[in-house]
């Protein structure tokens, strides 16, 4: 296999879709969702959300950028993990959630308790590779296929110079050093997407299925959130972890085996992969994690914002609409791309999101 630098694909990621059929009320406030979000003169006060720590860099840019269209709106976001974000949204603590995994059917049903009969919906906020990042001084561009990655993260392969790794890296001097696996300690959409890749692409080498909480049977180190795992891996010689690629920092990253090539992560092909993927009746997107397509990076997440179709009061509806319109606008997507290195959503995805967002209204 040869190294190939480019893009990505793969994963079953649900975009929940009550939004496709719900929302019959009028457009209360909000802009036209254009190049910069259109503006919303009715939006003011503080909008509170929480969720995926992978969104933290982009969220910082969005919180600042939304001021260009809603100068009196302040956005607060707690990056405590996707699971915590969805829980906080469903408990009424947050007006919106950021999540690297969509709500399941039970969560969608529960959303009616805070959102009314029309429930909640998902909008893709950005698309990002999941980097398999490691700390091994002087060793760059290690290649691994899916089976090898699964065996490393399950603890079956324990040394960096293991024969299975070495045979994929001819000419690269790998040390006789223990591998320390670092995983997320919290409920994590990044964990769910990473283990979904292992489940689909690695076959019997991964025995733990797709999970949001890392399997307790695996001996490994753990840390809270994206910053936590990157920080711990950076401080641990011989460590390997998985993280939103925008947060990988100075860690080296694995080139992932796809078909007859090894692919380094990049964002170029990400949005196109989503556009070309199959969409289920409920609005979920089925990405092919086991793809062998040339130049595709198969370890990927689509990060969502979760909103109510209807809010309990007009002020919150105006706040959410102004923020949501900015996030999916050309300016919002460009701002996130520049600050976080993610792939912007496509024009088709943006237009579909704008149609859903403009129908956000107040209950009653």
Regions found by a protein language model. Give the residues of each.
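Ligand-binding pocket segment of bilobal, Venus flytrap-like solute-binding proteins
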Residues: 86, 187-276
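Periplasmic-binding protein-like
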Residues: 117-134, 255-306
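Extracytoplasmic ligand-binding site segments that recognize negatively charged/polar headgroups
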Residues: 129-133, 139-227
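Extracellular/periplasmic juxtamembrane helices and adjacent flexible linkers that interface
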Residues: 2-4, 8, 41, 172-177, ...
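Sec-exported extracytoplasmic/periplasmic mature domains
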Residues: 60-72, 90-94, 102, 134-137, ...
């Amino acid at each position: 296999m040869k190294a190939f630098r480019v893009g990505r694909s793969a994963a079953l990621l649900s975009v929940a879709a009550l939004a496709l059929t719900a929302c019959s009320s009028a457009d209360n406030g909000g802009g036209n969702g254009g190049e910069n979000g259109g503006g919303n003169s009715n939006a003011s006060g503080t909008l509170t959300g929480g969720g995926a720590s992978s969104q933290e860099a982009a969220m910082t840019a969005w919180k600042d950028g939304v001021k260009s269209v809603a100068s009196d709106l302040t956005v607060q976001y707690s990056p405590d993990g996707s699971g915590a974000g969805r829980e906080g949204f469903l408990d009424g603590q947050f007006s919106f959630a950021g999540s690297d995994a969509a709500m399941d059917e039970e969560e969608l049903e529960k959303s009616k308790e805070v959102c009314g009969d029309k429930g909640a919906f998902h909008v893709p906020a950005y698309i990002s590779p999941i980097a398999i990042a490691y700390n091994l001084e002087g060793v760059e561009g290690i290649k691994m296929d899916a089976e090898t990655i699964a065996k490393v993260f399950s603890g079956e392969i324990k040394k960096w110079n293991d024969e299975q790794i070495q045979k994929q890296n001819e000419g690269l001097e790998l040390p006789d050093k223990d591998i320390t696996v670092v995983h997320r300690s919290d409920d994590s959409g990044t964990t769910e997407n990473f283990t979904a890749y292992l489940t689909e692409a690695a076959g019997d080498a991964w025995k733990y299925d797709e999970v949001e909480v890392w399997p307790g049977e695996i001996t490994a180190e753990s840390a809270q959130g994206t910053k936590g795992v990157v920080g711990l891996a950076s401080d641990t010689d011989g460590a390997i972890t998985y993280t939103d690629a925008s947060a990988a920092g100075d860690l080296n990253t694995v080139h992932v085996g796809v078909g007859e090539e090894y692919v380094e992560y990049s964002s170029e092909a990400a949005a196109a992969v989503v556009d070309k993927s199959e969409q289920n009746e409920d609005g979920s997107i089925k990405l092919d994690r086991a793809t062998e397509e040339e130049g595709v990076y198969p370890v990927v997440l689509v990060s969502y914002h979760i909103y109510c179709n209807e809010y309990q009061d007009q002020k919150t509806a105006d706040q959410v609409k102004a923020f949501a319109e900015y996030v999916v606008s050309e300016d919002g997507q460009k701002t996130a791309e520049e600050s976080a290195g993610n792939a912007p959503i496509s024009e088709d995805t943006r237009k579909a999101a704008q149609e859903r967002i403009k129908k956000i209204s107040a209950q009653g």
